[in-house]
């Protein structure tokens, strides 16, 4: 065979008297791999098909003082809460888990603060929650923490229009009671 620079020879030889046996059939691993993948997807899907009463969006700076106690208080009310400390594990895709949590929650609690409006991830979550709210698939419940109405208006005029609870006016327990009443009242109406 002639190539661009030179030639190549190929050949084979048959050894007389050698016992020629057919090769054993090659097993195609694809069906087994597909079955394993389907089973894994079913197991993951089963775990991820949970519905949540509420998704809690917040800035990490507000976690200690407001968000962690609020998430726990909501659980004590018997609500299913999507909160990062409850749901995220090492190796998880942050974006996928957040998107999934938002999509599978009936209500979105947003703890608005100066730190909240300064972060990219919280804005990403807020965009998702507002999209779900506008589409009628979720109810947005704002909590204002150490932030004024003017500051909320500057950041998001549409959020300033929503009735909100302020951490300066209500205790965490009172806020949790109010959120639980709204969620449980909506469940009765459904």
Regions found by a protein language model. Give the residues of each.
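Conserved N-terminal substructure of TIR/SEFIR domains
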Residues: 2-111, 121, 130-139, 145-148, ...
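Short amphipathic alpha-helical segments
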Residues: 52-54, 160-163
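Short, conserved catalytic or interaction motifs in soluble domains
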Residues: 114
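Glycine/Thr-rich phosphate-binding loops of Rossmann-like dinucleotide-binding domains
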Residues: 118
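Glycine-rich, charge-decorated loop segments at or immediately adjacent to ligand/cofactor-binding or catalytic sites
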Residues: 148-160
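Short secondary-structure boundary motifs at beta->alpha junctions and helix caps
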Residues: 162-170
């Amino acid at each position: 065979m002639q190539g661009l620079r030179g030639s190549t020879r190929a050949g084979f030889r048959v050894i007389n008297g050698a016992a020629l046996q057919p090769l054993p059939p090659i097993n195609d691993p694809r069906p087994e791999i597909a079955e394993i993948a389907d089973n894994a997807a079913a197991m993951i899907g089963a775990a991820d098909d949970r519905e949540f009463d509420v998704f809690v969006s917040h800035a990490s700076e507000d976690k200690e003082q407001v968000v962690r106690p609020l998430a726990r208080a909501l659980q004590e009310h018997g609500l299913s809460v999507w909160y990062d400390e409850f749901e995220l594990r090492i190796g998880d895709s942050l974006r996928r888990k957040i998107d999934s949590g938002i999509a599978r929650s009936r209500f979105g609690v947003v703890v608005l603060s100066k730190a909240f409006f300064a972060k990219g991830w919280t804005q990403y979550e807020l965009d998702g929650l507002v999209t779900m709210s506008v589409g009628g698939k979720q109810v947005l419940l704002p909590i204002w923490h150490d932030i004024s109405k003017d500051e909320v208006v500057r950041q998001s005029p549409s959020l300033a229009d929503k009735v909100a609870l302020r951490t300066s006016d209500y205790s965490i327990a009172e806020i949790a009671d109010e959120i639980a009443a709204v969620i449980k009242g909506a469940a009765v109406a459904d």
